Structure formats: C-alpha cells, structure tokens
Amino acid sequence: MSDEMTSATFTEQEWSHFEAKTLNEECGLFGVWGHPDAARLTYFGLHALQHRGQEGAGILVNNNGKLNRHRGLGLVTEVFRDEKDLEELTGSAAIGHVRYATAGSANINNIQPFQFEFHDGALGLAHNGNLTNAQSLRCELEKSGAIFSSNSDTEILMHLIRRSHHPEFMGRVKEALNTVKGGFAYLIMTENSIVAALDPNGFRPLSIGKMSNGALVVASETCAFDVVGATWIQDVQPGEIIEINDDGIHVDQFTDSTNMTICSMEYIYFARPDSNIAGVNVHTARKRSGK
C-alpha cells in the first residue's frame, strides 16, 4: 500500500486507533490475591510472560483497599530497574500486564494496568485481546460525553461499567462484557477482589493457580505458575466471570452463548512451549502439528 493511499484511506486518528488495536493481540496478564509480597510475585510472573509483550509493563497493587501503580515503557526488568519501585508497591494483591509492541505506538498512556479513581472507589484494569466493535463503541461513548485518556481499546470496558445502571458491581461488569465483542481476557482489581473474565469463545488463555500459602494466582499462561511456585487448579472457561477474594473463588457466567475456539496462534507462536493451554501442552501441540 502506497503512502498516498494510506493517508487517503485513514485519518491520523483512525490510524493511531488501528495501531493501538493491534497491540492488544498478544499481551500478558498476571494477578495474585492473598500474598504478602504480591508486587514482587507479579514481577516474576510478568517476567515469565515477557515473550507476550515487550513495549511496556506495569503492576497495580491493592493495599487494604488502596490502589497504587507503577508502569513504564520497556521490558519488565527495565521498568522495575530501581528496587524501590517494587518496594513501594506494598499490598497483598496485585495485577500486572506486559504489552506487545508495534512500531509508532509507544505511549506511556497506553501502558497497563489502568488505574481509575472514582467518587465511590478505585478500580484497576488490564486486558489481553482485541475488540472488534471498539471503534463504534468508542465513538458512541465519546458522543455521550466520555473522555478517554489513552487510545487503547481497554478503557472502553471501564466506561461501559460506569454507565451501567445495574445496582450491583458484578452486574454492571456482566452488562459491559456482553456489550464488547471480540476475543478478550480481563483482570479487574476492585478494593476487595480480583475479577477475571474471558470472552464467550475463549479466544485467549487464562488460568488460575494456587500457592502453598493459599494465595490465588491468575495468568495468561501456566508457565508463570512454575516460576512463582503455584499449582494449576483450573482454566477460566469461555463466558466465565470469576471473582477472587478472601473467601476464595466464585465462578459465574456473563453469557450462556459460548463455544471454545481458542486462537491457534497461541499454540503456533504466542505461548511458551512449557505452557499448557486448554489442557494441551504447547510443545507437544507443536510437535504433533509438524507430523
């Protein structure tokens, strides 16, 4: 495609939005609930998932309901080069994110997890995937007064949650999840829980593990469990919304219209060979596909 055709076809804003969408294709999520050094554990988890994103990284912690975050451009080791950046992230719960890189898209505002401060509490959000109706939803939200601080699709979910009239928070999240379309995995940090959700087709992997001290861990790939000493206990299934808190794990569905169609690129390219996705070892899948 020539430069003339590109400029004639896409406006600068549209092209920027397209670049941001491609970034979410292969990101890495990690979360932990109930560990005294949650940030450091998340650091190691993200390091194990570094292959899923090299543009930027971030960790958001929950310290007795108060959220705090550090993020930056570069590899996990570069973003947290200064030891004090981890030491200042105190708390027993955390979510982290590594972001995939595309040329011309490096922007600190797009680095996750996102942190939101509302009059009725704080929330954190991290996302892996691609929303097929992102542009139409964003236009609709902006026309109704929504203000975005990034050009990432991720922010759309939080605007939808806040605009829902459902009386319960989980009900608002379910409503928002049924509005967005595409392949996605989300981690939401509330003041008293981590919420994990997977799209109705299970396009991206998301698993839950448990540590010897009872801490619960969520990750895009099981290879991250091995690094932190967690044992796999279950995969997040298509259409599931799972709340993790001091009482344990509560599993629910935000839709009954589900069908497991995980992206084949997870086995071919995205995932690490020592990860297990949907019960299948990635290395084994690659060997079998070559026969």
What are these regions (language model features)?
Residues 2-238, 243-291:
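Conserved short alpha-helical segments that host acidic/polar catalytic motifs at enzyme active sites
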